[in-house]
UniProtKB/Swiss-Prot annotation:
UniProt function note: This protein is involved in the repair of mismatches in DNA. It is possible that it carries out the mismatch recognition step. This protein has a weak ATPase activity.
Originating species: Bacillus cereus (strain AH187)
GO cellular component, one term: cytosol
Cleavable signal peptide: none
Disulfide pattern: none
Coiled-coil annotated spans: none
GO molecular function terms attached to this record: ATP binding; ATP-dependent DNA damage sensor activity; damaged DNA binding; mismatched DNA binding
Biological process, per Gene Ontology: mismatch repair
Entry protein name: DNA mismatch repair protein MutS
Keyword terms, alphabetized: ATP-binding, DNA damage, DNA repair, DNA-binding, Nucleotide-binding
Entry's family note: Belongs to the DNA mismatch repair MutS family.
Annotated region (Disordered), positions in chain: 826-854
NCBIfam families reported for this sequence: mutS1, PRK05399.1
Compositionally biased tracts (Basic and acidic residues): 845-854
Amino acid sequence: MTQYTPMIQQYLKVKADYQDAFLFFRLGDFYEMFFEDAVKAAHELEITLTSRDGGSSERIPMCGVPYHAAKNYIEQLVEKGYKVAVCEQVEDPKTAKGVVRREVVQLITPGTMMEGRTIDEKENNFLAALTHFEDGSYALACNDLTTGQNTVTLLTGSVEDILLEVYATGSKEIVVDSSFSKDELNKLTETLKMTISYEDATAIPEGLEHLVKNVSQAKLIKAVGRLFNYVIRTQKRSLDHLQPVEIYYTNQFMKIDVHSKRNLELTETLRTKEKTGSLLWLLDKTKTAMGGRMLKQWMERPLIQKERIEERLEMVETFVNDYFLREDLKEKLKEVYDLERLAGKVAFGNVNARDLLQLRRSLLQVPAILEAISLLDNAYAARLIQGADPCESLTELLGRSIQENPPLSIKDGDIIKDGYNDKLDQYRYVSKNGKTWIAELEKRERDITGIKSLKIGYNRIFGYYIEVTKANLGALPEGRYERKQTLANAERFITDELKEKETLILEAEEKIVQLEYDLFTALREEVKVFIPKLQHLAKVISELDVLQSFATVSEEEQFVKPVLTTKREIFIKDGRHPVVEKVLNGKLYVPNDCIMPENMDVFLITGPNMSGKSTYMRQLALVTVMSQIGCFVPATEAVLPVFDQIFTRIGAADDLISGQSTFMVEMLEAKNAIANASERSLILFDEIGRGTSTYDGMALAQAIIEHIHDQIGAKTLFSTHYHELTVLEDSLDQLKNVHVSAIEENGKVVFLHKIQDGAADKSYGIHVAQLAELPDSLITRAKEVLAQLEGQEEIIIPKRVEVKAQAQEVIPEPVVVKEEPVEIEETKAETEEESQLSFFGGEQSSKKQDKPVLDAKETAVLTQIKKIDLLDMTPLEAMNELYRLQKKLKKG
């Protein structure tokens, strides 16, 4: 390294500690990058790659960005999952001896970003830390640096289960120890697309012990310690806004695994991965950013304590019934900014004057909000606002200190109000009156000299000056002015009087800017004292915001308050899928009941594709989730139990972790439900067994249904195309057949989207293909093949005619295949030969046989065959019927 210049040596020394990050190295007005950083950054940021002499024989790759535009470039890199170490000059270059001293002042990572376009105002930006213990358990700690929120939980289960819980936090970055399994790290980076960081220190850092007072378990403390040590090491600044660690256990909330959350589209849609079209999109009528974040957290973790759910429902009911209270609250909430993130900026030291004005405007709304809620006759409301401090002294302080329209930068002055500081007022008086004096001097000099174009100006190099054009130089009184600068068409002069005033004015202006900066930083420290109170207020206001949001959407969409029962019964009258109904935007939506008394556990749902089976199943799950987060539900009446878990297998399998096949994922999800569901769970299985052969699939589906029915007793909706399974209603007393109705009109299927008792009488597969606009020729051929499979009495099958190039088109002549009288074949081989030929559309055997005389049993079978409506049966149903008739004949 000795061959490099001192500056490059300094760069390499700093870079050695930040090998996994881009090093933004401050050089004057630029942040420069060198060596591999420069090559990679130039590519990622699409900026010019240059080179410079660094003392070695070869030039060093280099690229840079202006310091005033660095924020945008840093955000671009962090968005892509990179880390950026910001290295600043920490001494004045004018007074430095040798190379200017530089230090990394912050490491910016995906999990520690404080602001920017990557930070959604209504979403948390969690940094996760995962700690593995010898007994196979894990502790997961999370921190949102923008709000100061900290959580920790203990996890058990497979590695995939643990990683899915990590995925559920939405974290973009995870901190682990340096010995963490490489295989597990690969799953985090390749599948979950998370940035990996390392931290081996696990002791709680000095000064943060108060944040873990309520945490006694050593494993949890170790995970939190790893998280806090990483945050301190990377941020290198005050963390006064960090909140006490909240412990949560997964069994305290309704458990919904990641696959189920995605299938149900709770917070984002399956197709676009966006909020629009999800349940969160529908329910989010929050007026504050922090309310939006709390709503999402509630949706991620629905409650299972009946009393807590009912408390929320009662508050929502209060807001629904009191329009004026709700509207007044909404108007005030509109004026409340993000108190949590403002508190974080105060602690971090990057809050500006405009931020503090937002804080003041927010606090002005608080007294009226708290007073309105205090008047409610509601124990939950009283408990919610208990201890909430409106911080009126802070409001008053900000009101008399900050100008109404301050600049964005805190170093440009014009931030502090007149009257806040005596010394500042004095400097401003000198500056203001000095400029007035300058204007008066200009007028006086014009009168004395008679030169109307004479003017007094200012620039940073020469200060104040009197400027006279060369044409008027002869009119100047002798000895009155001292020449200062000669221009092409003018001369500039000064006087002793002007010099004196210049000194006073410039000193005052410099002191104003510096004093305002000092006063603002002191004010910022005063605001820090209020951070805990502001965070408590933020939680109160967030909760009120979510509750009014529930009330608003419940009234707008005509939702009803659910009644929670300790019984295992579901009674939903005219239930609707809330999102589908909203998307239909006024078009007719068909509501459906879901009535499952205590002695009814399984609905076996049949019906054609596109008829609404999956929508009906999702509808029940969404109604359940809405109920247990404390929202009204889309129905005219709803009585619901409190479910402990929801398991789903709906839609296309999407394996997040292990890369398994669709059928394997389907079976793993079925296993998850069977292994973990209780009689208090809700299971939704859509077309289980479709990923394998017909008989395997049907056998598995039946076995799963029987196990759920006999061993678990969970409320279950099980949709299937295996119509043969509907006979289970005869042997399973807590299973009921229901179907989605459809009718045929003019050869076309019309879906009624109505759930009715009993099994479906037809699958309408080819009709659905018609709706999908498959080619007419394909549809016609499908009907022909179906007719062959079902043994139709008379089938018209077009001959396949090969048409050679440029040959005349030949229209195939239809061949009529007539059904021979039913006869019992003497040998199995002959029977199979006939069957195979018929299946592939070949000609019947030419072997002539005498027409036998049928006995009474055979005649009865023939009569039954003629009465069968084959177009109303699935291929499997037709085959089963054929076996039954064959057995009947053989018995004879």
